[in-house]
Amino acid sequence: MDQRLAQLVEELTTAGEPQLEPGRMKELKKICRSSEEHLSHAYHLLLTRLHEEHAEMRFSAFQIVQELFSRSHLFRTLLVSNFQEFLELTVGTDHEQPLPPPREVAQKLRKAAIAAVQGWHEKYGEAYKKLSLGYHYLKQNKKVDFQDVHARTVAERKREEEKQKRLDNVYKEKAKRAEKEMAEMSQEVAGTLTEMENCFRLLLPDPFDFTVNSTGLEPNEQTSADEDRSASSLPTYVGCVDDEQPCCSKDILPISQCVRTDQNEELADKQKKPEQDLLDGDTCSEVESGVPVLGDDDYETFVRNHGLISHKYALDLELSTADIKVHENEDNTAVINSVADAHKLVRNKFLPSVQSWIQLFTRAGINDDRLRCAIDLKNRLEAALRKYKEMNISFKERKRKVMKASDDGDDDDDDEDDFVEVPEKEGYEPHIPDHLRKEYGLENCPKKDESVKKDSCSLTKTKQKNEDELDPTCAAATLKLIRDKLPNESATTEPAALEEPDSKRRKLEEERAKAPLMPFGLDLHYWGQDQPSAGKILKFTSEHRFWAPSEVEEEVENKEITEMLKTRYITFAGKFEPVKHKCRAPMPDGSLCERQDRIKCPFHGKIIPRDECGVPINAEDRAREEKMRFEKQATQPETEWRDPEFMREVEAATGVDLGSSKTNGKGGKKKGKKKYPNLTDLKQQANTARSRLEKIVFNKGAVKRVVKAMNQMDQRKHEKFANQFNYALN
């Protein structure tokens, strides 16, 4: 029974399932119910399982403990007597011994254990004093919040609080830096936005800005101007109506000048039309307010001149920005360049900075004017980017302009302002004529030919050209690259140049064929001449560093050096002869080796003559191969011929162990079977990016290679700087 009990506990705790198997659990309860000894034995088995470094095994063991705790007084007594150890293994009250992985199962175990302790205290707390003490110990000393869903311990809570405080401090510091940056950059951002808005207005005026071309008259001047215009435009207006000529918007009378006469009033009273009644009702308020009302004729004229059917409706004009396209020309190039520069600045610098400010303020929990100002800046920047996109600017083709250095004349003009005029000295002759040079004791100056002058001019020009080609910012460098890519012009002229000395070239080739060029030594180079004194050295009788008589110097000839000048090594490889024979050693698949090595095959050793079947022709070679074959068979294991699958079938049929478990195929290691395959493999779970990098970086071979490379670097440095005191100590 004890063996069966241990087997059941092992199977239940190593199943790796979140719920216990009901059949085995029922059998375990039945065995524990049979005697107190079995129950005590089950308690010790479960306590051993709780000590395992695997959260799934502990969780399954805790579930068994929970089932037995609610059914047996003896089991409760045993568990409460060692309650502190139980809490350390399930709740993790000892921060030095945390719960083992997997982490999710460990968290689940802690929550279930805390809930179980709370339930046991409510149900059995009065009967078991140690249980009540354990509950209060968790609540008061370990500060375990039984209402906390995550069931965190004090150490975990403290760690999280400290981590949160550190994060808050970091975010506050970043928010302060962001506030400082915003205060420094806000003025620049506002200036850039104003510049973009002004450029937009210059490129495309706002259709709803009606005062864009107004002259800005003062009120008094405007009223007087209106009166003069109305007085002057009245006769023209009447004339236009009578002559039925096309009118202009400037000639249309304003509503205030359309005065209703008495005659019009009588006509209006006589005509009783519904539309006119509605019109009278609408204009009644205008009459009461003192504003002149239009008559019938004036109203019809007003409507006809303005192209309106009635003045009671409004027109909504929608201007689509999809068809807008601004083309760059000579007039707006400067404006477009300014807009493009400002757009690049906003897109690459200002908008990312503002977005980072908003993110930092949000993380730091700032909800005051700083966040509102940042959001306002972001909205304005995004609106400017949208407007730039809607403008749909088409740029002209831009050519690369290379900035060249200013000429010498320009430098002289700039530097002339820095010089002070000085009067010339008396008797100073910058140029002395040729007939007076003898009097001054000077030689005659040789006359330069025109060719020399031309050569000097060409040299200066080529020098300046070379300097321009070396300068990567100059256009000459670009032209040089293009010329290099083009086919060489001299290639076309080479055939014409080679046609002239064709006979000389043929003669040279014939002579070279007769007498090929070979390397030679110095003795052949100076053949028939005085040989160089390479082997002679000066010998000093005195070995003192400073005091040595110069008269006693004597030359000593070193025979070894002179012999080295006259000796040479000539290697004769001979004529290449291709290999015609083959290895023809028998292969495992029955074929013959087709390698054509000259002396030795890398797989079958020295090449020997064989027949068509691969059998050695010489008797000695045959005897040697037979001996090697017997030795190889003796060293091979006896089980090589056995097939593991066939042996397992024979074992299953006969029931006799033929040793199939000992064989593991050809040349392979026997894989270790997992002890508990249903549990989560902790080693496989730890296969993270960090662990994989650790395997590669801290591999023994890699560490050895790194150490070897570093030692070589140190050795090279030591050899290079060994005589310097600064590096000798390193």
Swiss-Prot record:
Q: How is it modified after translation?
A: Monoubiquitinated at Lys-425 in response to transcription stress; this promotes efficient transfer of TFIIH to stalled RNA polymerase II.
> Disordered: where is this region?
213-232, 399-421, 485-509, 656-679
Positions the record marks as coiled coil are 155-199, 369-401
Pfam families recorded for this chain? DUF2043, UVSSA_N
Record's subcellular location: Chromosome
Q: Give binding positions for Zn(2+).
A: C583, C593, C601, H604
Task: Name a GO molecular-function annotation.
Answer: RNA polymerase II complex binding
UVSSA-type zinc finger positions in the chain? 580-607
Crosslink site: Glycyl lysine isopeptide (Lys-Gly) (interchain with G-Cter in ubiquitin): K425
Q: Which ranges are annotated Polar residues under compositional bias? A: 213-223
Biased composition annotated in UniProt, kind: Basic residues: 667-676
Bias regions of kind Acidic residues — which residues?
Answer: 408-421
Which biological processes are named by the entry's GO terms?
Answer: protein ubiquitination; response to UV; transcription-coupled nucleotide-excision repair
Region: VHS-like, residue numbers: 2-145
What does this protein's UniProt record list under function?
A: Factor involved in transcription-coupled nucleotide excision repair (TC-NER), a mechanism that rapidly removes RNA polymerase II-blocking lesions from the transcribed strand of active genes. Acts as a key adapter that promotes recruitment of factors involved in TC-NER. Facilitates the ubiquitination of the elongating form of RNA polymerase II (RNA pol IIo) at DNA damage sites, thereby promoting RNA pol IIo backtracking and access by the TC-NER machinery to lesion sites.
Q: Which family does it belong to?
A: Belongs to the UVSSA family.
Name of the protein in its database record: UV-stimulated scaffold protein A
From what organism does this protein derive? Gallus gallus (Chicken)
